UniProtKB/Swiss-Prot annotation:
The protein's name in its UniProt record: Larval serum protein 2
Domain of life: Eukaryota
GO CC, one annotated term: larval serum protein complex
Family: Belongs to the hemocyanin family.
Sugar attachment sites: 204
Molecular function GO terms recorded: nutrient reservoir activity
Self-association state and partner proteins as the record states: Homohexamer.
UniProt source species: Drosophila melanogaster
Xref: Pfam families: Hemocyanin_C, Hemocyanin_M, Hemocyanin_N
Length: 701
C-alpha cells in the first residue's frame, strides 16, 4: 500500500473569529500604504490630549466641520441625523460612554457611517482628525477601529493593540500611577537605550494582595490582555447594531450561530482552566440569589475614577434591577416558546436563535424578543446612576474590553448559551452513520504524552497612559520628528508594563490515516476534560459541551496511507503576540526612510486568539486531559473560501467566505450526546495527554 505525506492546507477554522487562516504569505507596503499607516499611528497616540502632535496638521484639518462638506460623503442623507444630533448634543469627554445604551448607540452609528462613507482618503483623514479633537475618546476609538476594519482603502493597515491605545481598560491603577511617577520626575535615574528612555514597570493582576474568592485565583486568565482584546475585536467585527455594508453583510457569516459558538467555546476554555485549580462546573447566573464570586478590578478611568467593585455573595435582586429582571423573564419565555415551536433542524435555525438572543440588527423581531445579551449586562451593571436622566455609570460589564475580566461573565453566558442547548435538545441525535467516514480510518495518532505550560514575562507599551507636553521645537530625536509623540522635552521614552502571562511549549501531532480512495477531507482537533474536580471520569454524555476547538483544516487524502502532520505554531486561528506600539513606529520609520520592507500578513491578526491561551494551565504534577481528533468528509461551503477578499491582509468579515466548510459550528459536539458508543467510529480518536505546569508565580511583586 502506498504511503503519502499530506501537507495540510492552511484553512479558516469553523470558529471564525477565532477563525482567520494562518497564511504564511505576506505583502510589502508601498509608499501610499505607509502614509496611511503613519496617519493612524499618529492619531491614536495619547488620545485624551488634543494638542500634542509633533507634526502639526494644517488649517484645513483644524477648521474642518464635516456637515459643511456633505458632498465628500456617499449617502449624505444617512448622515443628516448624526449632524443634527451632534450640533445639538455633542458627546464629548465629560460624558461616560458605552455602546450598550440606546442613546449612545445613536452616536456610534452616526460616527461609523461618517468614517465609512468618506469618499476618499483625504476626506477620511479630515473627518478622523475632527473626531479625534471633539468626540468622546472611547467612542472615537471604537468607531475609527470599526471603520478601519471595513473600509477598502484600509485593508491591511495595522492598528496598535487596543490595550496599548487604551491601557486604562487593561492595567491596574498602581501600574498607571508608577508610569505617571516616572514621567513627572523627568525619568530621573532612567537609562536611555538607543536614545530612548526605557522604563519597565512590574505589573500585577488584581489578586496581588490576596484573592477575594477561588475564581480570583485565576486572575492571570481572566485579565489576560490578549484574550480580552480578542473579545473586544470580535464584537467590533460583528457590531450588534448593524447588518453591515453592501460588501460586508454580516449575516452571510452566520453571525448568530457564531455568536453562540464563540461564547460556548469561551465557557469550555474557562472550565478547562478551572479544572487546573480543582474548581468545578461554571455556575449559571441566577438573578434571584446572591452571586458567590465578587470582583475588584483595580482599574480606573483616565480621569482617575475607580471602577466599581463587587463583594462576595452580592445580590442583584434589588429595586434598581426589578425592571430589567422582569424584561429578562418576559423575553426568556418568548425565546423558549420560539424554540419549542420550531420545526426546522438546520444551521439557519441556530443562526436565527443567536440573532434573537443577542438582539442584533438581523434579529427576526428585535422589538418582540429584545436583547437578552444587553439586559443581563444591565443587571450586572446595577443601574449606578450618574449625570442626568436615566443614564447609569457603565461599569466593566458594559464594555467589551473589560467584561471578560469579571468571572460573572462566564456565569451570565452559561445562562445565555443554555438556550442554544435547549434548541439542540429538540434536534435529532446524531447516530453512527452521521459521524462515520466510509473508507477512512485513523490508524494512529502520534503526539507527545505530556505537554508543558509556564508563565513568562510579557511587555506591553503603555506609554499612552501618561500625558505629554505639547510639541517642542529643535528636537533631533528621529522618532519624535517622525511623529511619535511619547517624549520628554523632545527625547523619546517608552514605558512598558511587564506581566506574567500563561504560555506553553510548542507541540505537534501526526495522524496516520488510511483512505480507500483519493478525496478531500477535513481534520478537526479539540481538547476536553477527562476527569472532574474530584478525579472522577466524566462520561461523554455529560462532557460534550466542554470540548474546546483547537484546529480545523482541509486536507487531500490519497488512496492508501496518509501521514497528516501539524505543528501547534501552525494551527489556523491562533496568532502571535502583538508587536508593541514603539516597535511598530520604528518599523514604519525605517520603511519610510530606508529600503526596509514593512511586511503585511496575518500572523498577528486582530481576529485571532493569542497562541499562548491554547492550553489550560494543568498542574505541577501533571493533569490528564483528552485530545479529540476527527477526519471527516469535506462539505463545500456555499461560497468558496476567501472569495471577495485578500486573506493575506484581511479577516474577510461579512463576505460569507471565511469558513473552510459548511459543517455546523462545533460538530460533532454541537448536539447532545445520549449514546457515547456512537462515537466509536474509525475516523474519530480520543487521546489522553498530561499537561504539566512549571511552578511559577503569576504576580511579580
Amino acid at each position: 500500500m502506498k504511503s503519502f505525506t499530506v501537507i495540510a492546507l492552511a484553512a479558516v477554522a469553523l470558529l471564525a473569529t477565532l477563525g482567520q487562516a494562518k497564511h504564511l504569505d505576506s505583502k510589502v507596503a508601498d509608499k501610499d500604504f505607509l502614509m496611511k499607516q503613519k496617519f493612524m499611528y499618529q492619531i491614536l497616540q495619547h488620545i485624551y490630549q488634543d494638542d500634542v502632535f509633533t507634526t502639526p496638521f494644517g488649517g484645513s484639518y483644524v477648521e474642518y466641520k464635516p456637515w459643511e462638506h456633505v458632498a465628500d460623503y456617499v449617502h449624505p442623507e444617512m448622515l443628516e441625523h448624526f449632524f443634527e444630533l451632534w450640533q445639538h448634543q455633542p458627546f464629548t469627554d465629560d460624558m461616560v460612554w458605552s455602546v450598550m445604551y440606546d442613546k449612545h448607540e445613536e452616536y456610534v452609528v452616526g460616527l461609523v457611517r461618517l468614517f465609512y462613507f468618506a469618499k476618499n482618503w483625504e476626506t477620511f483623514q479630515h473627518v478622523v482628525y475632527w473626531a479625534r479633537q471633539h468626540v468622546n475618546k472611547q467612542l472615537f476609538v471604537y468607531a475609527v477601529t470599526i471603520a478601519s476594519l471595513f473600509r477598502d482603502d484600509m485593508q491591511g493597515v495595522v492598528l496598535p493593540a487596543h490595550y496599548e491605545i487604551h491601557p486604562w481598560s487593561y492595567f491596574d491603577s498602581q501600574a498607571l500611577e508608577w508610569a505617571e511617577h516616572y514621567k513627572m520626575h523627568g525619568f530621573h535615574h532612567v537609562k536611555q537605550m538607543d536614545n530612548i528612555y526605557n522604563v519597565v514597570i512590574r505589573t500585577n493582576y488584581s489578586n496581588v494582595h490576596g484573592s477575594l474568592n477561588y475564581d480570583h485565583d485565576l486572575a492571570y486568565y481572566l485579565e489576560d490582555v490578549g484574550f480580552n482584546a480578542f473579545y473586544y475585536y470580535f464584537n467590533l467585527d460583528y457590531p450588534f447594531w448593524t447588518k453591515g455594508g453592501e460588501e460586508h453583510v454580516l449575516n452571510k457569516d452566520r453571525r448568530g450561530e457564531l455568536y453562540l459558538y464563540v461564547h460556548w467555546q469561551l465557557l469550555a476554555r474557562w472550565y478547562l482552566e478551572r479544572l487546573s485549580h480543582d474548581l468545578g462546573e461554571v455556575p449559571a447566573f441566577n438573578m434571584y440569589v446572591p452571586t458567590e464570586s465578587g470582583y475588584a478590578s483595580n482599574l480606573r478611568t483616565y480621569y482617575g475614577v475607580p471602577q466599581w467593585h463587587r463583594e462576595n455573595h452580592h445580590s442583584f435582586y434589588h429595586e434598581h434591577n426589578y425592571e430589567h429582571i422582569e424584561h429578562v423573564e418576559m423575553y426568556t419565555q418568548r425565546v423558549m416558546d420560539w424554540i419549542h415551536k420550531n420545526e426546522k433542524f438546520d444551521v439557519e435555525t441556530i443562526n436565527v436563535l443567536g440573532n434573537i438572543i443577542q438582539g442584533n440588527a438581523d434579529s427576526v423581531d428585535k422589538k418582540f424578543y429584545g436583547s437578552l445579551d444587553k439586559l443581563y449586562r444591565f443587571i450586572v451593571n446595577e443601574g449606578h446612576h450618574y449625570g442626568h436622566g436615566d443614564e447609569s455609570f457603565p461599569g466593566l460589564f458594559m464594555h467589551y474590553d473589560t467584561s471578560m475580566r469579571d468571572p460573572i461573565f462566564y456565569e451570565v453566558y452559561k445562562t445565555i448559551v443554555s438556550h442554544y442547548w435547549h434548541l439542540m435538545e429538540t434536534y435529532p441525535e446524531y447516530h453512527k452513520k452521521d459521524y462515520a467516514f466510509e473508507g477512512v480510518h485513523i490508524d494512529a495518532v502520534h503526539m507527545p504524552e505530556s505537554l508543558t505550560t509556564y508563565f513568562e514575562h510579557f511587555d506591553s507599551d503603555i506609554s499612552n497612559a501618561v500625558n505629554v507636553e505639547p510639541a517642542v521645537e529643535g528636537s533631533a530625536d528621529p522618532l519624535y520628528t517622525f511623529g511619535r509623540n511619547s517624549h520628554y522635552k523632545g527625547s523619546s521614552y517608552v514605558i512598558k508594563a511587564r506581566q506574567q502571562r500563561l504560555n506553553h511549549k510548542p507541540f505537534e501531532f501526526t495522524l496516520d490515516v488510511t483512505s480507500d480512495k483519493a478525496q478531500d477531507a477535513v481534520v478537526k482537533v479539540f481538547i476536553g476534560p477527562k476527569y472532574d474536580e474530584h478525579g472522577h471520569e466524566i462520561p461523554l454524555e455529560h462532557n460534550y459541551q466542554n470540548f474546546f476547538e483547537l484546529e480545523h483544516f482541509k486536507v487531500h487524502l490519497e488512496a492508501g496511507v496518509n501521514h497528516i502532520k501539524r505543528a501547534s505554531g501552525d494551527f489556523s486561528f491562533w496568532v502571535n503576540d502583538r508587536t508593541t506600539y514603539l516597535e511598530l513606529y520604528q518599523k514604519l520609520m525605517d520603511a519610510t526612510n530606508s529600503d526596509y520592507k514593512f511586511k503585511l500578513d496575518q500572523s498577528e491578526a486582530h481576529c485571532g486568539v493569542p497562541n499562548r491561551m491554547m492550553l489550560p494551565r494543568g498542574k505541577k504534577g501533571g493533569q490528564v486531559f483528552q485530545f479529540f481528533y476527527m477526519v471527516y468528509p469535506y462539505h463545500q461551503p456555499e461560497v468558496a473560501q476567501f472569495t471577495g477578499y485578500d486573506p493575506v491582509v484581511s479577516c474577510g468579515v461579512g463576505h460569507g467566505s471565511r469558513y473552510v466548510d459548511a459543517l455546523p459550528f462545533g460538530f460533532p459536539f454541537n448536539r447532545p450526546v445520549k449514546h457515547d458508543y456512537y462515537f466509536d467510529v474509525h475516523n474519530f480518536k480520543f487521546v489522553d495527554v498530561k499537561i504539566f505546569h512549571r511552578d511559577e508565580h503569576t504576580n511579580v511583586v
